[in-house]
Regions:
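Enzymes that bind and transform nitrogen-containing heteroaromatic metabolites
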Residues: 1-101
Length: 101
């Protein structure tokens, strides 16, 4: 098992993703909303594979950006729809290309 540490007090995502790419991995699946938000805020994510459910869920469901600085109406990245897939008649997968200002 190979273990590579990056950063002093926290992982250095740019270095970690560079190393992953050098090992031949071109795609990384990130399911942690706060880390996904971090990658977007650093302009390190080029695609967004986002799950949309047509079922309303209340409470603290919106966790993307919850622990980081939120994007405002003038500084958020735009997206272009790449594909739409459905799991059932009430659960869809939307894939977007992220476009930074």
């Amino acid at each position: 098992i190979l273990v590579i540490a990056t950063g002093d007090k926290a992982p250095d995502s740019k270095v970690a993703l560079y190393i992953i790419k050098k090992f031949g991995l071109d795609k990384v699946l990130v399911e942690t909303p706060s880390y996904m938000h971090y990658l977007v805020s650093q302009k390190m994510m080029d695609e967004l594979f986002f799950n949309y459910s047509c079922i309303y869920v209340g409470g603290q469901a919106l966790t993307i950006g919850k622990y980081g600085q939120e994007f405002g109406s003038k500084d958020h990245p735009h997206t272009r729809m790449l594909s739409i897939h459905s799991h059932s008649d009430h659960f869809f997968y939307f894939r977007h290309k992220l476009i930074y200002g």
